[in-house]
């Protein structure tokens, strides 16, 4: 077994990369939601100031529903983070037990 495969036999590097990617996706979603919300609000303000309101309410509701869908996806990502936290806590506990068992095996 090479040193490299031995160093990451538990897949910690992959978990770390997956975790970083999940955080990136969350940040990207937040930025996207923020941008879309600002755009809709600016557009709504323009429409109100120009008295062009006919038919716009339904379109705005559609856009806000799209944002709500993105918020739900964002909530799912946060749920994934919670699951990762539970997995890592469980992993730490199991790893500590393995270390204790190993020490017991080393006793004469």
From Swiss-Prot:
Record-linked InterPro entries: CNL1
Entry's Gene Ontology cellular component terms: BLOC-1 complex; cytoplasm
Keywords: Cytoplasm, Transport
Subcellular location: Cytoplasm
The protein's role, per its UniProt record: Component of the biogenesis of lysosome-related organelles complex-1 (BLOC-1), a complex that is involved in endosomal cargo sorting.
Name of this protein: Biogenesis of lysosome-related organelles complex 1 subunit CNL1
Assembly and oligomerization: Component of the biogenesis of lysosome-related organelles complex-1 (BLOC-1).
PANTHER family given in the database record: BIOGENESIS OF LYSOSOME-RELATED ORGANELLES COMPLEX 1 SUBUNIT CNL1
Species of origin: Zygosaccharomyces rouxii (strain ATCC 2623 / CBS 732 / NBRC 1130 / NCYC 568 / NRRL Y-229)
Family membership noted in the UniProt record: Belongs to the BLOC1S4 family.
Lineage: Eukaryota, Fungi, Dikarya, Ascomycota, Saccharomycotina
Superkingdom in the source lineage: Eukaryota
GO biological process annotation, one example: endosome organization
Cytoplasm found in the keyword field: yes
